[in-house]
Amino acid sequence: MKQRKETPKSSDLPIYLFKQGNNQEAYRYFGAHLCEENGEAGAVFRVWAPHAKAVSIVGDFNSWTPGEHPMEKVTDGIWERFVPGIKQFDVYKYCITTPADELVYKADPYAFHTETRPSNGSKVYDIEGYTWGDAAWVSDEEKRDVINSPMSIYELQAGSWKMKDPENGVPYNYAELADELIPYIKEMGYTHVELLPITEYPFDGSWGYQVTGYFAPSSRYGKPKDFIAFVDKLHQAGIGVILDWVPAHFPKDGYGLYMFDGAPCYEDPNPRRGEHKEWGTMVFNYGMKEVESFLISSAMFWVERYHVDGLRVDAVASMLYLDYNRKDGEWEQNVNGGKENLEAIAFLQKLNTAILGRYPHKMMIAEESTAWPLVTKPASDGGLGFNFKWNMGWMNDMLSYMKTDPLFRAGNHGKVTFSFFYAFSENFVLPISHDEVVHGKCSLLNKMPGDYEEKFSNLRTFFGYMMAHPGKKLLFMGQDFGQFIEWDEKKPLDWMLLGYDKHRELQSYVRDLNHFYRDTPALWQVDYSWEGFQWIVPDDSKQSVIAFLRRDAAGKMVLVVCNFNPVLRKEYQMGVPNPGSYKEILNSDDKKYGGAGVTNGTVKAKKGPMHGFDQHISLTLPPLSTLYLSVPAARKPRAAKAEDKAAEKPAKPAAKKTAKTTAKTAAPAADAGTEAAPKRRGRPPKAKTTV
């Protein structure tokens, strides 16, 4: 047990940094920490309550008696008290006397552990002492270039992926969940899991997006060290862990951050800025230095103490705009007369600089649903400083397109190609998330038009296109085997569907697609540059066909062809970059995936210009399908033989006897190495694209 330092000045630095907005590890100072004082075991408690007249600690240890353990004001707004006899798991709250002389009972904002809802007290907990086994993962991660690495994310909600006791709604704890999850993730080929928020929250129906405990993994699924074990086990299995993290707002629950000491403390005091009325939640005061320290410390805590590999920051757009979901008269302009939330922008820049400055190999992912510029550019260059952003525009366009009856897809072809106008403006993740399979939106499979067979064909086509499109990938649980009904957080997924051929075959397709993606650098190594992508057929809207190349850093290519129409296309011709044989390596219409088995095998390129190339191939495109074909390497020119060289030499003219002749040899031709395919980087022709 730690020996508590007695000298008050020992706390001067963390307090100073806290008040400057620069304490990135405020959790080490605030909250409850087991220690010894004068040889007596107990815990020291510290809390920030700037408007409080008095604060005391209450709990089982003093029968919840206000004033029995009063706290001392260390400095302006910060209260402290050592309580002897406190033990691990003791439940406590802060009893705060407000400026109006009312008593409010508050959970500890910095608590590491909490009671399980409906109870809401904080628990004393020591997170030290766990022996990590993920040293190999951490070492490899520190060398990893996350931008130019494969990333196929499996998004899940911890309580409803599977359940320990479905009849009674009993979930697995974190460690048990890891044991169930790891074999599935490895078999399916995902690189990361992303958990919906596990920071403590009171209301199950919020899915974790209304947080009351920014330093506590939800006790629904076990103790903090159970969650440490979850991350550790996944890392040892070679699987990354991303957490959803919510700095955009917090709920009004009376025991939480709302009006913490009887006055606005964590929330913006301006009613036109401090509340999301549509959500019924409060907005953080991003201009308050102590709130900055609180939030950045929370983010750093999960990265540093729980070894998570990235944070997906929720609802960034709501932070950036003062008029977000607000009517005229419900918001006010910033000091420059604009609608941008300048304090929130500065906070996000500071947050990302702090995390990525210390851990450049981690991921800071923005869920930003507008066209805000430079989201994934460094703060030093005027950006927000994230290194990834969800591509919500692509998601909306493609789901709208896929829901369209194929008879009318020709008129909506621009929804397939439009994303390439901006695909390389940010470091995008392509998200098919939980938000798209709830609230009457239908499951992904049920969004697809057509009969039973066509729904699966459409979905396989979409998954094939998604995996080939530039950007990292994210798929919500259940969609990879064709969950038919919407997600319900109270129930596990319908795993019994895997007893049906079509669902099992769809799952096999996604599995093979994931492994093919990971094994094919052309699909991920140059995700954020035109150098990694090349159109071949962008504008065949009449037949709803597109074709393009993906290219890795060494120039190796994969040809991708998508037919979004339920019509068989025989002898469909397209230009190709190199002569030689093109081998079909993955076909969504393969019988083993539930298709009709219309395949191409190997096709040989024929001479004849098309689509800007000197040769072309002819394919059979199955109805509703995505095809992947290997591209042969460019041929090196044949080395010239001696007699060829002699034949190529021009005859020397007869030398004039009256003139001095100087023999000159022609300059040698430039070395012809491996010929690169002609670069055709152009975007889809505007005249032929419907947007």
Task: Please state what every model-predicted region is.
Residues 307-309, 324-490, 497, 518-589, ...:
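Conserved alpha/beta catalytic core and glycan-binding cleft of carbohydrate-active enzymes
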Residues 88-92, 601-636:
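C-terminal beta-strand-rich structural cap/linker in extracellular carbohydrate-active enzymes
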Residues 502-523:
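Catalytic cores of secreted or luminal carbohydrate-active enzymes
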Residues 47, 94, 156, 185, ...:
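Conserved, mostly hydrophobic/aromatic
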Residues 48-55, 577-580:
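Short proline/glycine-enriched turn/loop motifs at strand-loop junctions of beta-rich domains
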Residues 1-40, 44, 73-155, 160-169, ...:
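The feature marks proteins involved in alpha-glucan
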Residues 115, 135-151, 157-340, 619:
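Substrate-binding/active-site clefts of carbohydrate-active enzymes
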Residues 635-691:
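Intrinsically disordered, polybasic Lys/Arg-rich low-complexity tracts
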